UniProtKB/Swiss-Prot annotation:
Keywords: Disulfide bond, Ion channel impairing toxin, Nematocyst, Proton-gated sodium channel impairing toxin, Secreted, Toxin. InterPro entries: BDS_K_chnl_tox, Myo_ane_neurotoxin_sf. Pfam families: Defensin_4. It comes from the Eukaryota. This is Pi-stichotoxin-Hcr5a. Its main location: secreted. Belongs to the sea anemone type 3 (BDS) potassium channel toxin family.
Length: 41
């Protein structure tokens, strides 16, 4: 996916998702335009 910033961390932008997908170890997320930014810090 596309890199994105969330709370000072670099995360992955997921298009058209309301929540982070399971199985990736994400524990931080930020709402983005038409999607969500997920970080596994």
């Amino acid at each position: 996916g596309t890199p994105c910033k969330c709370h000072g961390y670099i995360g992955v932008y997921w298009f058209m998702l309301a929540g982070c997908p399971n199985g990736y170890g994400y524990n931080l997320s930020c709402p983005y335009f038409l999607g969500i930014c997920c970080v596994d810090r």
